[in-house]
Amino acid sequence: MQWFNVVLQGVLIGGLYAMFAAGLSLIFGVMRLVNIAHGDLIVLAAYISLIVTQAMGVDPLTSLLLVVPVMALIGYALQRGLLNRTLGEDLLPPLLVTFGLSIIIQNGLLELFTADSRRLQAGTIEILTLQVTQSVWVGALPLIQFGVAVAAVAGLQALFYKTALGRAFRATSDDQSVAQLMGLDTRHVFAMAMALSLAIVAIAGVFLAIRTNFDPAIGPARLIFGFEAVIIGGLGSMWGTLAGGIILGISQAIGAQIDPGWQLLAGHIVFLAILAVRPQGLFPKVSG
């Protein structure tokens, strides 16, 4: 029963990793862009939530009503005003620009908030638990977190295949020139994709800030977790991203149970093993 609890906790933390990864998977699937600043944008969302909770006196989950649209607007403006100019056959310019953006965000947050760790307080929901079996209890907040992750992935999947915006994403991803001939403004489509990506980032950032301490320097580690979940699941696959996050979470939970120092190492080992056996990931949708 102890190992059942370990695996269950790994599944639940995997939901957070899936939210880290969903935005990466989305923008890579639409515009083949790898956003090096993705982890720092997660941290930025956490700090925006901190500002909202302190200024308005609301709880972190309620702050999502403001943090999500703010991050979406930042994503749209960032893509439309800067990143669209870097897209092309060469993958290096967007990598360099987003790397520079990562440094700017980290140093900006460091100047504004110092290097001190912060944490969002969500109240009684943090300590509320539900009994699964006689010896297994699950926190309400991790359950909510996982449910939100599943809903986010399902929502993105439905948007991609059942809406006009999703058809625009797929058309632009397949062939930009043909999409433009069809009357699509690819710059707007890419900006909408980034806005949607950062909306998911906002949710991930708030849940991260409730779950653990955060500071301006933790972004790169979140990027690695998200990247590993994307690669495990398969590039461009939303449900694969969820599966990748869960596999990564379970791996880390089992590693931590064996030895606390093995938590991160176990996740990296599983990532490398899957990459060696199945380089395209478990459920790939993007090739070439």
Which residue stretches match the model-derived regions?
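Transmembrane helix-bundle core of multi-pass membrane transporters
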Residues: 85-86, 90-162, 189-192, 254, ...
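Cytosolic-side transmembrane-helix boundaries in multi-pass membrane proteins
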Residues: 112, 174-181, 185-188, 258-288
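Membrane-embedded helix boundary and interhelical linker motif in transport proteins
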Residues: 8, 30-77, 81
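Alpha-helical transmembrane segments within multi-pass membrane transporters and channels
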Residues: 24, 57-101, 108, 243-248, ...
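Membrane-interfacial amphipathic/re-entrant helices at transmembrane-helix boundaries
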Residues: 1-19, 48, 58-64, 89-95, ...
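Pore- or pathway-lining transmembrane helices of multi-pass membrane proteins that form conduits
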Residues: 40-44, 86-110, 219-231, 260-278
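Helix-loop-helix "hairpin" substructures at the membrane interface of multi-pass membrane proteins
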Residues: 13, 135-214, 238-244
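Inter-helical junctions in multi-pass inner-membrane proteins, predominant
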Residues: 1-10, 16, 159-164, 190-232, ...
